[in-house]
Amino acid sequence: MKELFLIIGAPGSGKTTDASLIAQADATNITHYSTGDLLRAEVASGSELGKTIDSFISKGNLVPLDVVINTIVYALKAAPTKTIIIDGYPRSVEQMMEFDKVLSEQNEICLKGVIEVRVSEEVAKERVLGRNRGADDNEEVFYNRMKVYTEPLNEILDFYQKKKLHFIIDGERTIEPIVADMKELIKKIQSI
């Protein structure tokens, strides 16, 4: 059975970097995906699902939730490793509920933990505005992305806390101890 870990955190929390470094350090055992990468890879594959996704993306439309979840589940089942990390998902209560429903209807993937990389808004803002990655790293866009992240957060955390799947990592440190703690946490959860 595949073991899934979801990594969530504010923009600038380092969740993508953390997940990527963990998977790179243990590539024979851990695969890291981001939802956007999965959708782009499916389009590039030329599959029927990829053509469906492309029909939305090429028009600038959002990909429907059921298509996104089918893409994620398909990738999880086909992953080359037993342990899979997805960062930045779920982003809404609707995504969370639908993903939970789909996972509960199958027996190949087990959600083992939802790891929150917790940082203050000040630290997140400082990191995002300091990284200078492009046009989307300005103050107005940061506050919009922060709002999109925080609005559903309490409901998402409550849901996973009730299932005893929510774990917190202090993201306000340098990358090395964060990654080390996350690796250790994943190993600990897997041994339960």
UniProtKB/Swiss-Prot annotation:
Enzyme Commission code(s) on record: 2.7.4.3
Residues engaged in binding AMP: 35, 40, 61-63, 88-91, 95, 133, 145
Hydrolase listed as a keyword: no
Span list, region LID: 130-136
Associated pathway: Purine metabolism; AMP biosynthesis via salvage pathway; AMP from ADP: step 1/1
GO molecular function: adenylate kinase activity; ATP binding
Protein's cellular compartments: Cytoplasm
GO cellular component terms listed in the entry, alphabetical order: cytoplasm
Disulfide bonds: none
UniProt entry tagged with the keyword Cytoplasm: yes
Keyword line: ATP-binding, Cytoplasm, Kinase, Nucleotide biosynthesis, Nucleotide-binding, Transferase
Catalysed reactions, as listed in the record: AMP + ATP = 2 ADP
Annotated domain remarks: Consists of three domains, a large central CORE domain and two small peripheral domains, NMPbind and LID, which undergo movements during catalysis. The LID domain closes over the site of phosphoryl transfer upon ATP binding. Assembling and dissambling the active center during each catalytic cycle provides an effective means to prevent ATP hydrolysis.
Family: Belongs to the adenylate kinase family.
Primary role: Catalyzes the reversible transfer of the terminal phosphate group between ATP and AMP. Plays an important role in cellular energy homeostasis and in adenine nucleotide metabolism.
UniProt-listed PANTHER family: NUCLEOTIDE KINASE
Protein name: Adenylate kinase
Name of encoding gene: adk
